[in-house]
Amino acid sequence: MTLQDTVRYFIEETKILPCLSVTCGGAGLCVQARGGVINEQGTPVSDRTLFDLASLTKLFTGLLTMRLWEEGRLDLTRPVTDYAPQYRYLSNMPVEKVLGFEIGLITPERIDTQKTPEAAKQQLWAVQPGEIRGRAYSDIHAMVIRDVIEGAAQSEYGAELTRCILRPLEMAETFLHVPEERRVDCISCRGEHRIEQGKHILRTDAQPGIPHDPKAARLYPEIMGHAGLFSTQGDMVKFAQGVLREQVISKMTIRKMARNRTGFRRADGTYQQYLGTLCYVKHPVQYFSEIPAYESDEAIGLAGFTGQHMSIDIGTGVFTLFLGNRVMNRLTVLVPEAGKSLTDYGLQADGRGSIVWDDGTRVVSSVNYVHQKDAHFHQAVADTLGLPAWRRAGTAWS
C-alpha cells in the first residue's frame, strides 16, 4: 500500500474527505501524497494550502511550555496562579497537573456560547478543578496553559511561539492570523452537518482563515493555545523534522512529555485515555491509540477535529502527518437517539456512507473516520518506510 492509495481511499473510494495531504518520514526523509479540493469552487489542494490545525495547535503549546521549563523560566511544580493570577480557583493547582490532564477543569458556562470574547474569557478564568468524569482530554487545559506561558515568559504567546519554534524552524507559512491575501488558500469548513440526539444542525458561518473550533472562533483574534493555528504541509514537515532533530527541546524533555499521566484500565475493562503533556501517548489497545503501531512509547501525537493527525517518535525517528478536511459539506457528528445505532440512520457501522438531509440533499459522512486511519493510512506508512510493529501483539504492556 502506498500513500497515494491512502489519498485515493479517503478522497475517491469513500469520499470521507474532500481533500487530503499525507506525509511520513524521519529527520532527513519525507514521502508525500495529496489530492482533492479545498473549497466549494474546486480549488485543488497544493503546497500553498493552509490547513486549520485545530487541536494540533496543542502540540505547539506543549512543546513551548517544555521549552520554557528547559530554560528555567517555568517551574511546573508551582501553582497556576504564580504565572496566571486570573485563575483564582487554581491557586493550589500545580502547572504540571493541568499540563498533563490530571485533573478535571470545569467552567461555570460554556465558553463558545458567550456573546463576546470578554465574556468568554471571564468563563475561562472562573474555571474550577474537579474529578475527571469521562474523558480526561479537554481544550480548557491548553487554554489555561497558554496564559501560564505568557506569565512565565512575560511575553505574548505568539511572540514566544515565533521565538522558540516558528523562526528557528523557518516556518514562514504557519499563521496565528492568516493574512487576507492567503485566505484563498485556506480549506473551507462551510457546510458542516451534525445530528445530535435527533436534532439536525447545519453550520454555515465558518469563514476561511478563522478557526473552526467554536471556542477559538469566539475568542479570535486572540489565539488561546488549544486551537487556531493554520499551516501548510511543507511547514508541518519542518515542524516534525525540527522536533526529531532536537531543535525545539531535547530528547530527554520529549520523553517527559510522552509519559502517560492519565491512562489506566478500569475495573469494567474499559480504558481512560492515555495522555501526556498536552498530547496523546501510546495506548495498549491500538484501536484507541492516536500513536500508530510502529511507533514507540516515546512518541507524542494529536488529532484535530477538522481532519488532522500528527505523531512524532524520537524512539524510532519516525513522524506521520495527515492533513485533511472532514468538515466541508460533510456529516461530522452523529450522536444516536436512545436505542439507535449509526446503521439506523443509513450509515455503515463504522460511520462510512451518506445520509439524506432535511432539504433532500445527500451528505457524505466523516463520522468516526479516525478509526479508518490504521488500515488506510498507517499501513501505507509502514509499507512505505518498511516499519514493523514496535510491540508484538500480545506482548505485555508495562
Stretches found by the model and what they are:
Residues 2-51, 333-341:
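Short, conserved catalytic-motif segment at the N-terminal edge
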Residues 8-12, 50, 131, 218, ...:
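Short, P/G- and charge-enriched loop/turn segments at secondary-structure junctions
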Residues 14-21, 40-97, 127-140, 224-227:
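Short active-site loop at a secondary-structure junction
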Residues 21, 97, 310-311, 319-322:
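Structural recognition of the beta-strand scaffold that forms the well-ordered cores
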Residues 91-295:
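Short, surface-exposed loop or secondary-structure junction motifs
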Residues 245, 258-263, 284, 330-398:
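Short, gly/Ser/Thr-rich active-site loops of penicillin-recognizing serine hydrolases
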Residues 288-299, 336-341:
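Short, surface-exposed loop/helix-turn segments at secondary-structure junctions
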Residues 299, 306-319:
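Short, surface-exposed beta-strand/loop micro-motifs that present aromatic residues
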